[in-house]
């Protein structure tokens, strides 16, 4: 396996691509949206440092997967994921993993390309222990129930209204200025009856 040492041509190419440099910007999704829109959702530890491929302009991280929540059918006969791929530069939404704790588990939601798991700065990547118990329950079993019929509809400014009875109005950003408000940490948009979805608590019944 070859790591990709920078060359003069590679450095010049990077400088050309990043001038003028523009920061990657994206709106963080509700966790349910991240689950539903991702092809693969796993829990894993980052166990290796980034390896940069100067030709393809990507970097990859070695991981140790501990649990898969979504992606069994997409991965078919190769369910074990050992590497995650991302653009090599933050200006084009490359993800840079900054935690040095190799025993820390992360929830990672990404897309498949040629059998490889890809993520960006805009992907949902979060320390497992930082997530609420409701979010962990959502990724484990509940969010999937809303993927086919329901849509989390972000509301970031007034006025905003639902465009469909299958939409749930997400107001965390509007009310708290954060994407990590009550609806994000404790609720899921799930079918209430045919043709209608509502916010529902992710707390276990009886809790």
Curated annotation (Swiss-Prot):
Residues modified as Phosphoserine: 178
Chain segments carrying region Involved in metalloproteinase-binding: 24-27, 90-91
Signal sequence annotation: 1-23
Keyword list, A-Z: Disulfide bond, Glycoprotein, Growth factor, Metal-binding, Metalloenzyme inhibitor, Metalloprotease inhibitor, Phosphoprotein, Protease inhibitor, Secreted, Signal, Zinc
GO biological process, one term: response to hormone
Glycosylation site positions: 53, 101
Location(s) in or outside the cell: Secreted
Record-marked site positions (Involved in metalloproteinase-binding): 37
Cysteines engaged in disulfide bonds, as pairs: 24-93, 26-122, 36-147, 150-197, 155-160, 168-189
Annotated NTR domain residues: 24-147
Modifications after synthesis and translation: The activity of TIMP1 is dependent on the presence of disulfide bonds.
GO molecular function list: cytokine activity; growth factor activity; metalloendopeptidase inhibitor activity; protease binding; zinc ion binding
Quaternary structure (record): Interacts with MMP1, MMP3, MMP10 and MMP13, but has only very low affinity for MMP14. Interacts with CD63; identified in a complex with CD63 and ITGB1.
Function per UniProt: Metalloproteinase inhibitor that functions by forming one to one complexes with target metalloproteinases, such as collagenases, and irreversibly inactivates them by binding to their catalytic zinc cofactor. Acts on MMP1, MMP2, MMP3, MMP7, MMP8, MMP9, MMP10, MMP11, MMP12, MMP13 and MMP16. Does not act on MMP14. Also functions as a growth factor that regulates cell differentiation, migration and cell death and activates cellular signaling cascades via CD63 and ITGB1. Plays a role in integrin signaling.
Protein name according to UniProt: Metalloproteinase inhibitor 1
Organism expressing this protein natively: Ovis aries (Sheep)
Gene field: TIMP1
């Amino acid at each position: 396996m070859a790591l990709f040492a920078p060359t003069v041509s590679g450095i010049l190419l990077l400088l050309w691509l990043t001038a003028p440099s523009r920061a990657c910007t994206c709106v963080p999704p509700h966790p349910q949206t991240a689950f539903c829109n991702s092809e693969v959702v796993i829990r894993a530890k980052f166990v290796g440092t980034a390896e940069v491929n100067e030709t393809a302009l990507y970097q990859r991280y070695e991981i140790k997967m501990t649990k898969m929540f979504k992606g069994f059918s997409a991965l078919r006969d190769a369910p074990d994921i050992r590497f995650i791929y991302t653009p090599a530069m933050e200006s084009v939404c490359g993800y840079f993993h900054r935690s040095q704790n190799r025993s820390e588990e992360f929830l990672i939601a990404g897309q498949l390309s040629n059998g490889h798991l890809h993520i960006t700065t805009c992907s949902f990547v979060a320390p497992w222990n930082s997530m609420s118990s409701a979010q962990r329950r959502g990724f484990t079993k509940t969010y999937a129930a809303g993927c086919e019929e329901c849509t989390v509809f972000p509301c970031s400014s007034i006025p905003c209204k639902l465009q469909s009875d299958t939409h749930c109005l997400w107001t965390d950003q509007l009310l708290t200025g954060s994407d990590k408000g009550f609806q994000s940490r404790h609720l899921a948009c799930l079918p209430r009856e045919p043709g209608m979805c509502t916010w529902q608590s992710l707390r276990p019944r009886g809790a």
